[in-house]
C-alpha cells in the first residue's frame, strides 16, 4: 500500500511545484482556469522562430546544400549522432525527432532569454522572459521525457520492462521507483535554476554597473544556455536508451 501511495505523493509534489512563482506574472482567465500568459506568449514566439527558420531553410532544397539549408542539415546530423550515441545504433531512428525538438526548443528558448530585450514589451503585470525561465515549462519538458522513456521501455520490452524495479533484488523496489520519479525532478530544476540564475545575475549587473561590464557575463550566459540544452537532450536520450537496453 505504501509503495502504491508513493507515486501518488510524488505527482502531488510535482503539482505543488508547478505553482511556484518568481516575481509577478500575467495570467489569462480561460473558463475556470488561470493560464500563465507570459509562458504561452514566449513559447509561441520560440515555436514560430523554429518553424519559420525550418521552412525558409528547406523551401528551395539543393543537392549540394548551402546557407541555411547547410546549417539545418548540420544541426540534424548533430542531433542524430547524439541520439545514436545515447540510444544505440538499432533503436535511435524513431527518437531523433523527439530529441531534436527538445534540444532546439530549449536552446532557442534559452538564447531568447539571453539575447532578446523582453522588457521592452509591456504587460499589465510582470514581464516576458524565456520560457525555460518558468518552472512550469521545465517540469512539462521533464514529464514529457518521463512519458517518453516509459513508453520506449514498455513498447520494447512489454510487461518485462517492470521487472527492472525488482533487480537485482526486490528489496530495492522502493529505491528503483524513487529513481524514476527523481529523474524528471532533477531535469526540471537543473534547467530552471540555471536559466533563472543567469537572467537574474545579468539583470542585477546591468542595474548596478555600466552596460559594458555585464557583457562578458552575457556571453558566458549564452554558452551556459547552450550547454543546458545539450545536457537536457543528452540525458533524455540516455534515459530512453536505458529503458530499452534490457531487451537483448
Curated annotation (Swiss-Prot):
Predominant location: plastid
HAMAP family the record matches: ATP_synth_a_bact (MF_01393)
Function: Key component of the proton channel; it plays a direct role in the translocation of protons across the membrane.
UniProt membrane topology term: Multi-pass membrane protein
NCBIfam families, per the entry: ATP_synt_6_or_A
Disulfide bond positions: none
Domain of life where this protein originates: Eukaryota
Pfam families in alphabetical order: ATP-synt_A
Location of this chain's protein in the cell: Plastid, Chloroplast thylakoid membrane
Source organism of this protein record: Cryptomeria japonica
Gene: atpI
Protein name listed in UniProt: ATP synthase subunit a, chloroplastic
Keywords: ATP synthesis, CF(0), Chloroplast, Hydrogen ion transport, Ion transport, Membrane, Plastid, Thylakoid, Transmembrane, Transmembrane helix, Transport
Key word Transport present: yes
GO molecular function per UniProt: proton-transporting ATP synthase activity, rotational mechanism
InterPro entries: ATP_syn_F0_a_bact/chloroplast, ATP_synth_F0_asu, ATP_synth_F0_asu_AS, F0_ATP_A_sf
Family affiliation: Belongs to the ATPase A chain family.
GO CC terms of this entry: chloroplast thylakoid membrane; plasma membrane; proton-transporting ATP synthase complex
Subunit annotation: F-type ATPases have 2 components, CF(1) - the catalytic core - and CF(0) - the membrane proton channel. CF(1) has five subunits: alpha(3), beta(3), gamma(1), delta(1), epsilon(1). CF(0) has four main subunits: a, b, b' and c.
Transmembrane parts of this sequence: 38-58, 96-116, 135-155, 200-220, 221-241
